[in-house]
Amino acid sequence: LMSNLSVSTPAVTIDMQCASALMSIEMAYTHIASGVMNSAIAGGIESSSLQPDRIYATEDDRDGLYKVAQFTPQDRSPLAMLEGAERTIHKHNITKEELYPYIIGSHQRATKALDNSFLQSYIMPFSINGKKCVDECIRPKMNEKLLSRMKPLLGKDSITNAGNACLTHDGAAFVYISNEKGPFRIHSIMPWAGNPQFSPEGALESTKAILKRTDLTMDDMDVVEWNEAFAIIDALFDKSYPDHMGKYNMLGGALAYGHPYGCSGAILALHCMAALESCNGRYGLCAIAGAGGTGTALIMERI
């Protein structure tokens, strides 16, 4: 209602946690493909800095204030996502030190993308009180020594820390989708669901599912964008597709840029477009794992 769009423009809010923006793209795509719409703006907005405290109703057996939604009936922990990452790390026998290269590499690639303006045409300039807003958590000098000093978040023996888990950010990202020919087209998109106890596996499993459904392989992909909410997600890609790390998160990922939950899926799509243009590629794959064991994957084609 604060935009210059007509008040007669239909709108809907989607809550699929981390996968929300990519799911909004899926919904827009299916509406257009079915003829319900001719065009749509899809994506998301997240303001983590204004995340409100909420309180359960007096009739609810749950009590007190909370900030984080309850993702499964059995788990009320506000640290559910961190705990899911920790479980996934141990399930796949990954050490803290094995995660270092993925973290450092993400920051280095993000720094290179920033220095070379690879994303400049995809980022709208934004200022507050005359001060230009920039990505604040890219660390060009991220190194193993710094990572080794980071304190565990889930007890002294845990691996998950502020280095191998993304920061929460404010952000907004959108794509315009229509039934007219453009520089990119959606080849296929699909949701996925699995065990919420190991939610970071959603990016890998949704990738496997969409490749199987489309009869494509990782060899066909020129660019892969996964939301690296945790470095274990990078490790899962490396273990599953070791020969394809060169096409993975080419411009850096959420470990460097941060993860504004509601819009990260649209950020993936925009990064995928920019990366396809930079490498003159054809197919790009985006995948994101979401809270509660959800996920979404998308394959786009550069025309």
Q: What is the predicted role of each segment?
A:
Residues 15-46, 89-119, 175-180, 260-281, ...:
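Active-site-proximal alpha-helical scaffold in enzymes
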Residues 50-56, 197-199, 260-261, 295-301:
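Short acidic, glycine/serine/threonine-rich loops at helix termini
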Residues 86, 187-256:
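Active-site pocket-lining segment
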Residues 98-183, 245-246:
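N-terminal extracellular/periplasmic Venus flytrap/periplasmic-binding protein-like
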Residues 12-16, 40-46, 98-105, 123-128, ...:
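Beta-strand segments within the central parallel beta-sheet cores of soluble alpha/beta enzyme folds
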Residues 39-87:
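Flexible glycine-/small-residue-enriched beta->alpha junction loops
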Residues 90, 144-201, 205, 209-213, ...:
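Condensing-enzyme catalytic core mediating Claisen C-C bond formation in acyl metabolism
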Residues 1-37, 76-80, 141-167, 240-272, ...:
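Conserved catalytic cysteine-centered active-site region
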